[in-house]
UniProtKB/Swiss-Prot annotation:
InterPro entries: MACPF, MPEG1. Homooligomer; predominantly forms a homooligomeric arc-shaped pore complex instead of complete rings of 16 subunits. Forms arc- and ring-shaped pre-pores on top of the membrane at neutral to slightly acidic pH conditions and converts to pores upon acidification. Undergoes transition from the pre-pore to the pore in a processive clockwise hand-over-hand process. In the pore state, 2 alpha-helical regions refold into transmembrane hairpins (TMH1 and TMH2) in each protomer that form in the ensemble complex giant beta-barrel transmembrane pores. It is found in: Cytoplasmic vesicle membrane. The lineage of its organism: Eukaryota, Metazoa, Chordata, Craniata, Vertebrata. Residues 30-345 form the MACPF domain. This is Macrophage-expressed gene 1 protein. The chain crosses the membrane at residues 113-120, 127-132, 235-244, 248-256, 654-674. SMART domains: MACPF. GO terms for cellular component: cytoplasmic vesicle; endolysosome; phagocytic vesicle; phagocytic vesicle membrane; phagolysosome membrane. The MACPF domain includes the central machinery of pore formation: acidification causes a significant structural rearrangement, leading to oligomerization and deployment of the transmembrane beta-strands (named TMH1 and TMH2) that enter the membrane as amphipathic beta-hairpins.
Length: 713
């Protein structure tokens, strides 16, 4: 009976606790409870998510969202999370405009203008890998066209995050994984994880979005049409506007009818047209603006976004469980990963379509449009290798110079050290060891052991140190890797008559000595440069002394192209501008760029972090692996442990000595017991022998007495 009453009492306590919870936390957490209680829709256009500012793509959620309080917008129309607030547009904000974009360099996104125009990092390439931009650039260049854009925008809310918003669990865990590697001084692994963070969460965090709808028409019109009407560019935009209004069945005013002939010319010169509907009801031919606008309320989308770089949100108040200096190091690691993402997707070159040096792949102008080409001689490449551990790796990494047959440059050329890196390969082999117990009982134990072989390679290319004879160098026929093609052949191969030379881990450099047959496949070569070494050919004076610092760029009249990203280091090569610019635009190069180590190096166990600016120290609890601010007594104890460990024997040594002493004592005790038992057994045998001897003597005496004194018969 008592147990039954106790069970009822516990049930009542749980029920009361559930009843005291806020509305949004009863039973199943989430917006569904609020939605059922308030009978309102949930606002889906929310900030706090990650954003890839190169591709204009929403990424993983960075800021946490909860619906504990069942908040609503100020006008009571939508349910919103606790971590955001809205600014409703009280007035009607229907905007219509028409514009001409003469060059793709003036591109502006329809739905992410604000975040693309922020000035942090490499803002010149923001949005340059979005589908919208790449379509516009391709059509402008291929059709020799300009772009006209007409749009109708209706903004309903501006939704912003609160300053007290917390980081999401998934994002926090990813940061903690990076922190764990930084604590252990595993810098390469931390860099790899930071690049994965960029892959999953983007480069920025959205802090504000405009919720509404937009109807956009983009036309591409021949450039000649705009040049013929340069003095009346306004009438060109007006013609674009009339074409748009005709699509949405809008009644055109009588003033526009006089422009019928210009509108017809506009339509006849239009090479491409597209109408997009962002939010509202789906667009269809013949829809009216009135019908489209009435459907906006229940179909809101983001029509503009604003935000800050991802590393801005990695700060001590967002990660209170970590030491301040460690958070600062974490933020710097993530910022560096974002910069690498921008750097590896920045393609300098001539962006003027009318220049003979125009580079279709370039997304940033480098003032090479008017430069004249200088003929340079290519002295070949070679690569040295040194085994560091494990199996033989250098046989696949070494490369001799085709001109010398050795690891050297021909006379008149100087070597330029491009890069040195360590190559790792994992392998397993059967290893057998003899294991003994008490040095008596032995057996052979075999197991499959995983090991890492390492080798260091050093890549060089040869530059002419002065005047060299004609046809003394090699012909250059492009490069390719196991993941990229050679622009000369559009395949992973060299042109006919060319030989692939190995450089780095996977790069193939196509060269030829045949000036008669190979010349038609050759391209003017302007040098190599890497993340650590510039190009001596940029300045003719530095070519004479390759040890002098040189710029990481191409000479005038040459454009740079990616050769390979070798373990986080970009290596580029230079060819004559205007070559290798055909085909479609290059896709974005996504991280990670760094190879994770096959096996972790010797880790450093960080237990104390001190901030030199505030003189505050953090101690890591070995039981929970949690950080906390250290009290003076705890700091002294921790320092004593650290210095004690360093001055005394290690844990392994202490354990070994303890085990040895224990075994020795066991042997001594065993021998003592064995000796004692053997000694006692010997005593027992002597006593038995004595008793036996006495008994036999007594028997003999009795017999003798019987013979001497026989009893009377």
């Amino acid at each position: 009976m008592n147990s039954f009453m106790a069970l009822v009492l516990i049930w009542m306590i749980i029920a009361c606790a559930e009843a005291d919870k806020p509305l949004g936390e009863t039973g199943t957490t989430g917006f569904q409870i609020c939605k059922n209680a308030l009978k309102l829709p949930v606002l889906e256009v929310l900030p706090g998510g990650g954003w890839d500012n190169l591709r204009n793509v929403d990424m993983g959620r960075v800021m946490d969202l909860t619906y504990t309080n069942c908040k609503t917008t100020e006008d009571g129309q939508y349910i919103i999370p606790d971590e955001v607030y809205t600014i409703p547009q009280k007035e009607s904000n229907l905007e219509m405009n028409s514009e001409v974009l003469e060059s793709w360099m003036n591109y502006q996104s329809t739905t992410s203008l604000s975040i693309n125009t922020e000035l942090a990092l490499f803002s010149r390439v923001n949005g340059k890998f979005s589908t919208e931009f790449q379509r516009m650039k391709t059509l402008q260049v291929k059709d020799q066209a300009v772009t006209t854009r007409v749009q109708v925008r209706n903004r309903i809310y501006t939704v912003k995050t609160t300053p007290t918003s917390e980081l999401s669990l998934g994002f926090t865990k990813a940061l903690m994984d990076i922190c764990d590697q930084l604590e252990k001084n595993q810098t390469k692994m931390a860099t790899y994880l930071a690049e994965l963070l960029i892959l999953n969460y983007g480069t920025h965090v959205i802090t504000s979005v405009d919720a509404g709808a937009a109807l956009v028409q983009e036309d591409h019109v021949r450039s000649s049409f705009l040049l013929d009407n340069q003095n009346s560019q306004n009438t060109v935009t007006a013609s674009a506007g009339i074409a748009f209004l005709n699509i949405v069945n809008f009644k055109v005013e009588t003033d526009y009818i006089s422009q019928t002939s210009l509108t017809k010319d506009y339509l006849s010169n239009r090479t491409n047209s597209r109408v997009q509907s962002f939010g509202g009801v789906p667009f269809y031919p013949g829809i009216t603006l009135e019908t489209w606008q009435k459907g906006i309320t229940n179909h809101l989308v983001a029509i503009d976004r604003a935000g800050l770089p991802l590393h801005f949100f990695i700060k001590p108040d967002k990660l209170p469980g970590l030491p301040g200096p460690l958070v600062k190091k974490l933020s710097k690691t993530v910022e560096t990963a974002v910069r690498h993402y921008y750097t590896f997707n920045t393609h300098p070159g001539c962006t003027n379509v009318d220049s003979p040096n125009f580079n279709f792949q370039a997304n940033m102008d480098d003032d090479s449009c008017d430069a004249k080409v200088t003929n340079f001689t290519f002295g070949g490449v070679y690569q040295e290798c040194t085994e560091l551990s494990g199996d033989v790796l250098c046989q696949n990494l070494e490369q001799k110079n085709l001109l010398t047959g050795d690891f050297s440059c021909p006379p008149g050329y100087s070597p330029v050290h491009l890069l040195s890196q360590t190559h790792e390969e994992g392998y397993s082999r059967l290893e057998c060891k003899k294991k003994c117990t008490l040095k008596i009982f032995c057996k052979t134990v075999c197991e499959d052991v995983f090991r890492v072989a390492k080798a260091e390679f050093r890549a060089y290319w040869c530059v002419a140190a002065g005047q060299v004879p004609d046809n003394s160098g090699l012909l250059f026929g492009g490069v390719f890797t196991d993941k990229t093609i050679n622009p000369m052949t559009n395949a992973q191969s060299c042109p006919a008559g060319y030989i692939p030379l190995n450089l780095f881990e996977s790069l193939k450099v196509c060269v030829s000595l045949d000036y008669e047959l190979g010349f038609k496949f050759s391209v003017p070569f302007g040098g190599f440069f890497s993340c650590i070494m510039g190009n001596p050919l940029v300045n003719s004076d530095t070519a004479k002394d390759v040890r002098a610092p040189s710029l990481k760029k191409c000479p005038g009249g040459f454009s740079q192209h990616l050769a390979v990203i070798s373990d986080g280091c970009q290596v580029s090569y230079c060819v004559k501008a205007g070559i290798f610019t055909g085909g479609s635009l290059l896709p974005v190069r996504l991280p990670p760029y760094t190879k994770p180590p096959l096996m972790s190096q010797v880790a450093t166990n960080t237990v104390i972090v001190t901030n030199s600016e505030t003189a505050r120290s953090w101690i890591k609890d070995p039981q929970t692996n949690q950080w906390k601010l250290g009290e003076p007594l705890e700091l002294r104890r921790a320092m004593t442990v650290i210095h004690g460990d360093s001055n005394g024997m290690s844990g392994g040594e202490a354990a070994g000595i303890t085990l040895g002493v224990t075994i020795a004592l066991g042997i001594v005790i065993t021998l003592a017991i064995y000796g004692t038992r053997k000694y006692k057994k010997k005593e027992y045998q002597e006593i038995e022998e004595q008793e036996s001897l006495v008994g036999s003597l007594a028997t003999d005496a009795t017999v003798l007495n019987g013979e001497e004194d026989p009893s009377p018969a």
